Each structure stands twice: as C-alpha cells, then as structure tokens.
Amino acid sequence: MTLALQQTLKEAHLTPQEIDLVAVTQGPGLVGSLLVGINAANVFAYTYKKPLLGVNHLLGHIYSAQIEHEIKFPALVLLVSGGHTDLFYLTDHLQIKPLGTTIDDAVGEVYDKIAKNLNLPYPGGPLIDQLAQQGKDTYHLVRPYLKNDNLNFSFSGLKSTLVNLVMKQNLKDINIPDLCASFQTSVINVLCEKTKRALTKYHVKQLIVVGGVASNSGLRQKFMTSFSNLEVIFPSLQYCTDQAAMIGIAAYYQNQITKASKKYDLTAKPNLFF
C-alpha cells in the first residue's frame, strides 16, 4: 500500500501536505481486504493530520455516475456487480432508499460461476458477453423470480440450471455462444423487468446503472432501447469496476453532510448497507 500511495501522489503531482481529505472504503466486503485499505488510511491520515472519512462501497458505485454526469433527483439506480444486485431510489445527495436486492446470488457472481463451468478464464463476465453476441437464445431459459410483485432478485435457480446442464453434457456438445446468449438474455430481461416495475412506482428524472456488470454491452443496449423515454446513465467502462475515483467523489458529497473527523480509529464494516 505504501508503494501504491507513493505512486498515486507522484502521478497526481501532489504532496501529502496538499491532500484535503483521506477517504477509504469501510464496507461492505471481505474483512481482510477492507482492513488493508483502512489501516493504510488510518496511518496516512494520522501521519499528516488530515481528516478521515469511511465510505460505503455501494455509495461509491452509485456516485461513479457523478464522475462524468450530473445526477438529477429523483433518480433510480440499478447496482449490478459481483457482490450486489440492488435497486435504489435517490431523492437527493445521500438520501437513498433501498427498493430491492438479491435474496441469494448477485448477477456478477453467477456470471463467474457459469464461466468457470464452461472453462472460461476469470473474470468470466466479459467473455460471456462477447460470446453472447455471437450466439442466439436457443435454450429459452427461465426468467427467474418474476412471478411476484416485489423488486427483489433471485438468480440461484438459474445458476443451478446452467451448472447441471453443463455437467450432464460434454462441453464439446454444447453450443457455447448460444448458451451464453440464452443465459445473458435471461439475466438482462429480469433486470429490465424489475427496473420497469420500480419505474411504475417511483417517478424519476434519471435511470442510473452502475457496478461491474454495468460494463456489459448487452445490458447497455437493452436498457438504452427499453428506456428510451428516460435519461439513462451508464458510467464509462473504467468507472464501472471498483476504483478509487468513485470512493473519492462519494466522499466529497458525504463530507458536505457528515464531516470527516480527525479520529484515526476507523474499523471495517463487512456487512455495511444503507
């Protein structure tokens, strides 16, 4: 971490003394990974007597849209990543209402699991997306968890169906592009349908899609065409996956409401939500 901090300051042409605020991801996530960043932030902020702020990782993803666009309130946010599949309603900065979440597996997690069973290298999401563009929806897989009136998601059944299908057949007998296309079509249709349901309940000025899976070309195309009557915001690909810029911009807005302190005892919150 020391080398990373030194390199970052060098590329930014800044000295530690010129930093105004130190922000670090406090959760959710794996506690070991969180502690690496938190311990480094505690020490850095203490050494240079800078205010310190712990930031919700999910808030960072939401504010990744603000890096290149101006969020217009109220807004609906779909966060899709390896660890999360959530719908949020935003009425103002840091005024966030959770509407729905996954009750089991997150979308990105399922992508990686299917890719592993197809012997595709990690990370599997981009490769499945590429293969899906070459295939057709010939398997007609179930659109899971739509026979209800809530805004939650469930992808464990779809994952199990695909894993069992691959296990029962020889990989060489499977049309992998068609299977990827069928899987991706199922997932995207579910995300689209749940988003449509949310929009019938909440009036918004923007629809924002963030998280690692927001880089998926099929998802981007589907949402841009399905919600053409609404301003749809996707971050650039570099801001979809985890990066420091989103934590920095989230901290900027968070600090305007909850001022950072000069207490250097931040701890990890692996189950942090809203």
From Swiss-Prot:
Binds 1 Fe(2+) ion per subunit. One of its GO terms (cellular component) is cytoplasm. GO terms for biological process: tRNA threonylcarbamoyladenosine modification. It holds the Pfam family TsaD. Fe cation binds at H57, H61, D242. The keyword DNA repair does not apply. InterPro entries: ATPase_NBD, Gcp-like_dom, KAE1/TsaD, TsaD. Keywords: Acyltransferase, Cytoplasm, Iron, Metal-binding, Transferase, tRNA processing. It is an enzyme of class 2 (transferase). Signal peptide: none annotated. It is found in: Cytoplasm. GO terms for molecular function: metal ion binding; N(6)-L-threonylcarbamoyladenine synthase activity. Belongs to the KAE1 / TsaD family. Required for the formation of a threonylcarbamoyl group on adenosine at position 37 (t(6)A37) in tRNAs that read codons beginning with adenine. Is involved in the transfer of the threonylcarbamoyl moiety of threonylcarbamoyl-AMP (TC-AMP) to the N6 group of A37, together with TsaE and TsaB. TsaD likely plays a direct catalytic role in this reaction. This is tRNA N6-adenosine threonylcarbamoyltransferase.
